[in-house]
Swiss-Prot record:
Alphabetical list of Pfam families matching this protein: PIP5K (PF01504)
Processing after translation: Ubiquitinated by the SPOP/CUL3 complex. Ubiquitination is stimulated by PtdIns5P levels.
Residues binding GTP, per UniProt: N203, V204, K214, D369
Protein name: Phosphatidylinositol 5-phosphate 4-kinase type-2 beta
Entry binding sites for ATP: R202, N203, V204, K214
């Protein structure tokens, strides 16, 4: 099952690049015709499909309440001989959206406007991330880094259907204030007879603050170190033992720690009730002083580049500006923030370090990978690991109740 993969469902702003957007002029080119140009057909189909389904939904009145059938519903379209724009889109493809009314309702509860969501996915092609699950799970981010697009398996789609009603009810009850993944859309794309399933979530990390270090934490210490291959990446995903061996702590202060752990406990109890396990806490750390230094270096380079571009009369785009063949956007221009500042309505998982912390940091923390039920395969894996490591070892495949308890205890110990 693809859910056995460990993966990172957040995409960080790459160091030494995010700050370019502050100094470069932004030229947003509004196109009369949308051209869903991307480096590969599957992404063009995703852009076309999200654009189509959001447009269709805009004509459907918002119901007073969701009905049981909404959790089984889908919309699908088959496109044949699509001659218009054929240099970008395949001539034949199919696009299916699962539970459109439910995900529209979830987007609203998470404070995400459908027009903004549509623009983020369709205005410019999604960007590949170097984050990848062991089973080849693929991650992309929308051009503005606000949303993450993840390929999933048909089993994951089935599990989403299994939990969606209870997940939606939980989001209603907590008013969208949760550390759980914010599921915003689920799709099936068929190109050349190959089916690809994709889920869109809010990015855990900031769309503008650089993440300098990140961790995938499960509360388990058996085989929980980053591989040498992972460590060679620009922004490796470190694990539990790496975190402990570094003596790392997240300095949030007593009040923030209390509030965070209360939210975490509620979320994790919900997952245990659903018999879900193997989830992680994804942690990203933004070093404010380091970011300021990087920004100064980037600004110097950006000014030189701007002079060169202005010299040849070309309009200079910011790192996620509109290419000349992309649809325009209604999103407002980003506000300017001071070092380490963020908009809590956008960076919903962000938390500042306490003023007494040794370094000024911003932490991004959320639960990821919640589509792993405790089924027969997990029970067999648990038995095998218990034989290998002993009954007392902190292996990752324990039952959901044990997993949630251990998870909460570990997270309580890393916050200070």
């Amino acid at each position: 099952m693809s859910s056995n993969c460990t993966s990172t469902t957040a995409v960080a702003v790459a160091p030494l690049s995010a700050s370019k957007t502050k100094t470069k002029k932004k030229h947003f080119v509004c196109q009369k015709v949308k051209l869903f140009r991307a480096s590969e057909p599957i992404l063009s189909v995703l852009m076309w499909g999200v654009n189509h389904t959001i447009n269709e939904l805009s004509n459907v009145p918002v119901p007073v309440m969701l009905m049981p059938d909404d959790f089984k519903a889908y919309s699908k379209i088959k496109v044949d001989n699509h001659l218009f724009n054929k240099e970008n889109l395949p001539s034949r493809f199919k696009f299916k959206e699962y539970c459109p009314m439910v995900f529209r309702n979830l987007r609203e509860r998470f404070g995400i406007d459908d027009q903004d969501y549509q623009n983020s996915v369709t205005r410019s092609a999604p960007i590949n991330s170097d984050s990848q699950g062991r089973c080849g799970t693929r991650f992309l981010t929308t051009y503005d880094r606000r949303f993450v697009i993840k390929t999933v398996s048909s089993e994951d789609v089935a599990e989403m259907h299994n939990i969606l009603k209870k997940y939606h009810q939980f989001i209603v009850e907590c008013h969208g204030n949760t550390l759980l993944p914010q599921f915003l859309g689920m799709y099936r794309l068929t190109v050349d007879g190959v089916e690809t399933y994709m889920v869109v979530t809010r990015n855990v990390f900031s769309h503008r603050l650089t993440v300098h270090r990140k961790y995938d934490l499960k509360g388990s210490t058996v085989a929980r170190e980053a591989s040498d291959k992972e460590k060679a990446k620009d922004l490796p995903t470190f694990k539990d033992n790496d975190f402990l061996n570094e003596g790392q702590k997240l300095h949030v202060g007593e009040e923030s720690k209390k509030n965070f752990l209360e939210k975490l406990k509620r979320d994790v109890e919900f997952l245990a009730q659903l018999k879900i396990m193997d989830y992680s806490l994804l942690v990203g750390i933004h070093d404010v002083d380091r970011a300021e230094q990087e920004e100064m270096e980037v600004e110097e380079r950006a000014e030189e580049e701007e002079c060169e571009n202005d010299g040849v009369g070309g309009s200079l785009l910011c790192s996620y500006g509109t290419p000349p063949d992309s649809p325009g956007n209604l999103l407002s221009f980003p506000r300017f923030f001071g070092p380490g500042e963020f908009d809590p309505s956008v960076d919903v998982y962000a938390m500042k370090s306490h003023e007494s912390a040794p370094k000024k940091e911003v932490y991004f923390m959320a639960i990821i990978d919640i589509l792993t039920p405790y089924d027969a395969k997990k029970k067999a894996a648990h038995a095998a690991k218990t034989v290998k490591h002993g009954a007392g070892a902190e292996i990752s495949t324990v039952n959901p109740e044990q997993y949630s308890k251990r998870f909460n205890e570990f997270m309580s110990n890393i916050l200070t």
